[in-house]
């Protein structure tokens, strides 16, 4: 899966945590951008457009894409393998650039993952927070 899945989605929230970004859409779908850390590499968000919340939240994504660059060079001289990964997300309010930096000894992945963690709500599926009876018990869906 790639970040182009966000094209046309309206973002109701974006959560930045230590090492990941979660994109929550108005149709119930949720996407996660992260790196699954191993032992011998370091991959992290190096920089993000300062006004990212204002540009993304409540807006529809008009264009989202990923690009990589190794021509920028390593952040310090000792890295034998490094990757700069850029994610650009545009809305009518502007563009956000998320710059990830990864370094390793060359044997470990420096890639950023983008996955869907929740699918859009549909008519046949109860919305989160609604009650449903299963085997005689009432459950609140979360």
Functional labels for PLM-detected ranges:
Residues 1-125:
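Surface-exposed, interaction-prone regions used to assemble/regulate multi-protein complexes
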Residues 126-142:
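Short, low-complexity, charged amphipathic interaction modules
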